[in-house]
């Protein structure tokens, strides 16, 4: 898929969900703050409770770029964990390696973060990890393989180019961007995680 086509699809998906999934999509949405298609400007009819919950689930899924089967597994684990299921769900998703690569500013989008992991540019505590869903534990360090550091995308990242367009680094990550290193210092708290989601609606969707 060409870069332009991928961008158009992402922008269209962002407008349909009502959230910017990439910095580029955010710029498009500032210019066109309404849904896609010829009826995007029209006043929408009231969504059913089911439609509202479904959309919220889709929004959360899209922000982590995961499949439905993966999402359901995370939900089942969140349900078994002590505490509020919705908060647990977001906190578990946030410990994915690709999510933390994005939060650290090594990538500009969750899709790019996933590719960096799959192509074996990312290490955890000195070992290559090529599984985007790898769960990072407290105290583990994420860093770029030394052979990859000279690549243009990582040179841009080390200069802070991605951090300039992403949300501020959350408190559970300590980042040395010029060294392309980040450490998960503690478990993420839902209130700190920079995703747009009413997680209780997601819980209600799966509990139906």
Curated annotation (Swiss-Prot):
Ranges for region Disordered: 29-48
Cellular component, GO annotation: small ribosomal subunit
Gene Ontology BP annotations: ribosomal small subunit biogenesis; translation
Sample GO molecular function, one term: rRNA binding
Start and end residues of each S4 RNA-binding domain: 95-155
Pfam families: Ribosomal_S4 (PF00163), S4 (PF01479)
Keywords: Ribonucleoprotein, Ribosomal protein, RNA-binding, rRNA-binding
CDD domains: S4
Top-rank taxon: Bacteria
Cross-referenced PROSITE patterns: RIBOSOMAL_S4, S4
Subunit structure: Part of the 30S ribosomal subunit. Contacts protein S5. The interaction surface between S4 and S5 is involved in control of translational fidelity.
Family membership: Belongs to the universal ribosomal protein uS4 family.
Known role: One of the primary rRNA binding proteins, it binds directly to 16S rRNA where it nucleates assembly of the body of the 30S subunit. With S5 and S12 plays an important role in translational accuracy.
Annotated protein name in UniProt: Small ribosomal subunit protein uS4
Record organism: Micrococcus luteus (strain ATCC 4698 / DSM 20030 / JCM 1464 / CCM 169 / CCUG 5858 / IAM 1056 / NBRC 3333 / NCIMB 9278 / NCTC 2665 / VKM Ac-2230) (Micrococcus lysodeikticus)
Lineage: Bacteria, Bacillati, Actinomycetota, Actinomycetes, Micrococcales
């Amino acid at each position: 898929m060409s870069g332009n086509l991928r961008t158009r699809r992402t922008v269209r998906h962002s407008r349909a969900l009502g959230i910017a999934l990439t910095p580029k999509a955010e710029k498009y949405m500032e210019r066109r703050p309404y849904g896609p298609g010829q009826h995007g400007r029209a006043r929408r009819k009231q969504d059913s409770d089911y439609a509202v919950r479904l959309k919220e689930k889709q929004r959360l899924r899209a922000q982590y770029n995961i499949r439905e089967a993966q999402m359901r597994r995370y939900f089942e684990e969140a349900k078994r964990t002590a505490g509020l299921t919705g908060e647990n769900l977001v906190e578990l998703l946030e410990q994915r390696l690709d999510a933390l690569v994005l939060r650290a500013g090594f990538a500009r989008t969750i899709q790019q973060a996933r590719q960096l992991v799959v192509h074996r540019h990312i290490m955890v505590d000195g070992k290559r990890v090529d599984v985007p869903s790898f769960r990072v534990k407290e105290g583990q360090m994420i860093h770029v393989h030394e052979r990859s550091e000279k690549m243009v995308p990582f040179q841009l990242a080390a200069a802070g180019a991605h951090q300039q367009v992403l949300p501020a680094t959350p408190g559970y990550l300590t980042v040395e961007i010029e060294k392309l290193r980040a450490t998960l210092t503690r478990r993420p708290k839902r209130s700190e995680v920079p995703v747009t989601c009413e997680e209780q609606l997601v819980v209600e969707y799966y509990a139906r």
